[in-house]
Amino acid sequence: MSTMIQTLYKPVEPNTFNIAKDIKLLICDVDGVFSDGLIYMGNNGEELKTFHTRDGYGVKSLLNAGIEVAVITGRQSNIVENRMHALGISLVYQGQDDKLQAYQDICDKLKISPKHTGYIGDDLIDWPVMEKVALKVCVADGHPLLVQRANYVTKTLGGHGAVREVCDLILQSRNELEVHQGLSI
């Protein structure tokens, strides 16, 4: 059995740590990953979601380190567009029933191979992309099948800093955790 590597959040397998070191593109789902998965609906049809500022800080830190960040979500929402724009994420794919096609498009645009990509998901719709990437991440409260199949399961719940945890893992694996700081937003 290999010796685990201690990260800020939990011990990880050396192989997972090495995979994280080679990530050039992190793709995230939104509902259940960036948000807690709850959708608040008002009487007039308005929709509200919450996003954790820690996740924003982590994303900005990755971008400052030259690591691309993209979003693929099954739903369509102006809230998501505005939040991702505020974070500096330009590759935002919404309303995607076929997340694999969106993933291929992102990789083609950026000319990044699957061995340099990671994906954070929480439900079965995310698996087709997750099985293609090197760093397969499921949030702590994700679907049990994804938890079983992921090579990293966050300690943190979706919408409560899970994205930040993965950003920190990637930066720590590169010895750049304290070098690239984002702005909390």
Model-identified regions with their sequence ranges:
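Non-catalytic pre-domain segments flanking phosphatase-related domains
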Residues: 1-28, 176-185
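Short, flexible loop segments at the rims of nucleotide/cofactor-binding pockets, characterized by
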Residues: 3-5, 10, 46-49, 94-95
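Asp-based phosphoryl-transfer active-site loop
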Residues: 22-39, 130, 163
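Short secondary-structure boundary segments
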Residues: 30, 74-75, 96, 140-143
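A positional/architectural concept
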Residues: 34-64
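Substrate-recognition element of Asp-dependent hydrolases with the DxDx(T/V) motif
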Residues: 59-83, 93-94
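Feature captures the catalytic cores and cofactor-binding loops of soluble hydro-lyases/lyases
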Residues: 78, 97-102
